[in-house]
């Protein structure tokens, strides 16, 4: 089975799915193409858990979960986690790794819009990390995430800002110079300015709570969260 056999939905980019299908078998290789995701996952998890007031006992949805790096880590925190992705191969890898790790995660192959039509208002926390820049209609994803979270629940987004610096750092630097991710992973035209993301959020029941930047230091080869959202950034919102 491949991505083309997945349920039909307008908000799917099969070329984007194919990129991740091609390298799915190496999703949990700590030195492979997804090494940056493994490196930043503790920061993402810590931010989500802190801003959401902990994850234990909460029902969590990870939108665009891929091979399950974040989904598994949230399950280890005591959350009941569902992972959504349209890539068949990444989900197979995620399911196998969860089985081998003794971690319970419910992985589902469908779009967030399809999931929202069936599970509106059912989640305490919804995460959508590094996914918005890979779909044709990111605003539709934001809208669906808002529909899925309970009143008072938390929704987290992370993506890349669209400007010259982000192109230099995320495309030229990360893909061609440092070779941290495969060439062609990112398309700067699909990057999203914070004002654009906040505009979409404002058209839903979500309210902005906090925004932070994710920064890479090539000298120390380390990542940190902090002020400045000119490249990678994370947004915490809450359902009104």
UniProtKB/Swiss-Prot annotation:
SUPFAM superfamilies: S-adenosyl-L-methionine-dependent methyltransferases
EC number: 2.1.1.222, 2.1.1.64
GO molecular function, one term: polyprenyldihydroxybenzoate methyltransferase activity
Pathway assignment: Cofactor biosynthesis; ubiquinone biosynthesis
Key words of the record: Methyltransferase, S-adenosyl-L-methionine, Transferase, Ubiquinone biosynthesis
Matches recorded under HAMAP family: UbiG
NCBIfam families: UbiG (TIGR01983)
Superkingdom, natural source: Bacteria
Protein name as catalogued: Ubiquinone biosynthesis O-methyltransferase
InterPro entries named in the record: SAM-dependent_MTases_sf, UbiG_MeTrfase
Function field: O-methyltransferase that catalyzes the 2 O-methylation steps in the ubiquinone biosynthetic pathway.
Pfam families: Methyltransf_23
Swiss-Prot/TrEMBL GO biological process terms: methylation
Catalytic activity reported: a 3-demethylubiquinol + S-adenosyl-L-methionine = a ubiquinol + S-adenosyl-L-homocysteine + H(+); a 3-(all-trans-polyprenyl)benzene-1,2-diol + S-adenosyl-L-methionine = a 2-methoxy-6-(all-trans-polyprenyl)phenol + S-adenosyl-L-homocysteine + H(+)
Residues annotated as binding S-adenosyl-L-methionine: 44, 64, 85, 129
Organism: Escherichia coli O45:K1 (strain S88 / ExPEC)
Family membership: Belongs to the methyltransferase superfamily. UbiG/COQ3 family.
């Amino acid at each position: 089975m491949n991505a083309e056999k997945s349920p039909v939905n307008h908000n799917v980019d099969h070329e984007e799915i194919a990129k991740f299908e091609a390298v799915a078998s190496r999703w949990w290789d700590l030195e492979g193409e997804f090494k940056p995701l493994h490196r930043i996952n503790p920061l993402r998890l810590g931010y989500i858990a802190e801003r959401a007031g902990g994850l234990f006992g909460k029902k969590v949805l990870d939108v665009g979960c891929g091979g399950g790096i974040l989904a598994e880590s949230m399950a280890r925190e005591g959350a009941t986690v569902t992972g959504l992705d349209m890539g068949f191969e990444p989900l197979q890898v995620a399911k196998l790794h969860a089985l081998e790790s003794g971690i319970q995660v419910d992985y589902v192959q469908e779009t967030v819009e399809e999931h929202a039509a069936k599970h509106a208002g059912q989640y305490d926390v919804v995460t959508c990390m590094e996914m918005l820049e890979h779909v044709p209609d990111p605003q539709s994803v934001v809208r669906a995430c808002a529909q899925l979270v309970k009143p008072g629940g938390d929704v987290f987004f992370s993506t890349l800002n669209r400007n010259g610096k982000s192109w230099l750092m995320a495309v030229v630097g990360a893909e061609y110079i440092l070779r941290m991710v495969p060439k062609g992973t990112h398309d700067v035209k699909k990057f999203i300015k914070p004002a654009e993301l906040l505009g979409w959020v404002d058209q839903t029941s979500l309210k902005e709570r906090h925004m932070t930047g994710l920064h890479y230091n090539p000298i120390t080869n380390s990542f940190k969260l902090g002020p400045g959202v000119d490249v990678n950034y994370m947004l915490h919102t809450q359902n009104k």
